[in-house]
Amino acid sequence: MTRIIGGVAGGRRIAVPPRGTRPTTDRVRESLFNIVTARRDLTGLAVLDLYAGSGALGLEALSRGAASVLFVESDQRSAAVIARNIEALGLSGATLRRGAVAAVVAAGTTSPVDLVLADPPYNVDSADVDAILAALGTNGWTREGTVAVVERATTCAPLTWPEGWRRWPQRVYGDTRLELAERLFANV
């Protein structure tokens, strides 16, 4: 079990998948949201939670005032845990899409998001994550001002952000590195 750190559901526990996931620690999640909320008010934002695992990142965003979160998870067991966590917390604005992150992002959207949270398994190659970041911009997911946060192992190669993103300072917590960037201009 892990818990929601802040907002209306702060302190409430959520389930985590039994195997095969690496939930973001409370310390890293709290730091991530402190970094983002120092620059952005989450109230009313649209959020995309990629490689959602237990849904902890997206649920934290909803608890802190985000209007909507689209959770994307390919593993059926993890997706079932996310669905149970959404129901248990009773937070509105949550949508769960089961499927491979690359396929969902490639399908595109007409509703860009304000915040992208991505916590890919550490064994996902950095080049694959780079491709997802590029596809976010070309498939309508981002707009000027969209912030993206990617959690990686410190042993993983640093990400190569596509043109049009301004990197924020990365943060390291033990074996975890947070890479952050802001979209400078609208999709082309």
Swiss-Prot record:
Region annotation Linker: where it falls in the sequence: 17-24
One GO molecular-function entry: methyltransferase activity
GO biological process: rRNA methylation
Region (SAM-MT-fold): 25-188
PROSITE patterns, per the entry: N6_MTASE
Top-level division of the source organism's lineage: Bacteria
EC number, as in UniProt: 2.1.1.-, 2.1.1.171
Biological role: SAM-dependent methyltransferase that binds both to RNA and DNA. Specifically methylates the guanine in position 966 of 16S rRNA in the 30S particle. In addition, can methylate and modulate host cellular DNA within an infected mammalian cell, altering the host epigenetic machinery. Binds to specific host DNA sequences and methylates cytosines predominantly in a non-CpG context.
Family listed: Belongs to the methyltransferase superfamily.
Protein name, per record: RNA/DNA methyltransferase Rv2966c
Organism: Mycobacterium tuberculosis (strain ATCC 25618 / H37Rv)
